[in-house]
């Protein structure tokens, strides 16, 4: 068995640092880089692209709502389909330009935060994101939360998909993520997270916060780079995967 490990990086902004990108990028096989709307800036994007290129990991765009103050974790109501398409295409294009200048290429797109959460439940938003990805480059892999409406939107657009599960987030019984506003939504114990992910991969099931097993396709596992002890969590998980005979590789290299 082989799995991809993806991490959201490039979330620093100006003089304000966020995360431990240099350490995390050594443990991931794919990275999702903030494109300036919810976090990041041109210089941070370039630094993160260079790091990713040095370590041979997949480079992905991580578009979100234009909400620096809220880190893209607050829904923005009233956007039209066209407005969503434009904000997604804008951010993908920005990272593509930076990557091209650095001699690398963008391989995938993963929606960030509230944009992703809304799209998981709202067909219009999901279709708009998928439409933007296809319009920019139909060869981009669309990284989507497993069992969400983004899966159907990506399939309808004819995009290659990577189904994602989360190492450090709890799930509701319907397969959606537990809101960050609720207790227990974000997991922090590295050993428990590692055991959980190994069990998920071996069983093909995620266990919800109430104990309900949910079947999910799993192509990539996300570890959030802004989680406290993210580096320790990632290292513990990598070791647990190795101990259980589970290899890691970029999803585009997994047969």
From Swiss-Prot:
Coiled coil: none annotated. Signal peptide: none annotated. It catalyses: 5-oxo-L-proline + ATP + 2 H2O = L-glutamate + ADP + phosphate + H(+). Transmembrane segments: none annotated. It comes from Nitrobacter winogradskyi (strain ATCC 25391 / DSM 10237 / CIP 104748 / NCIMB 11846 / Nb-255). The keyword Nucleotide-binding applies. Forms a complex composed of PxpA, PxpB and PxpC. InterPro entries: Glyco_hydro/deAcase_b/a-brl (IPR011330), LamB/YcsF/PxpA-like (IPR005501). GO terms for biological process: carbohydrate metabolic process. Gene3D superfamilies: Glycoside hydrolase/deacetylase. It is an enzyme of class 3 (hydrolase). GO terms for molecular function: 5-oxoprolinase (ATP-hydrolyzing) activity; ATP binding. Catalyzes the cleavage of 5-oxoproline to form L-glutamate coupled to the hydrolysis of ATP to ADP and inorganic phosphate. The keyword Cell inner membrane does not apply. Its EC number is 3.5.2.9. It comes from the Bacteria. CDD domains: LamB_YcsF_like. It holds the Pfam family LamB_YcsF. This is 5-oxoprolinase subunit A. Keywords: ATP-binding, Hydrolase, Nucleotide-binding. Belongs to the LamB/PxpA family.
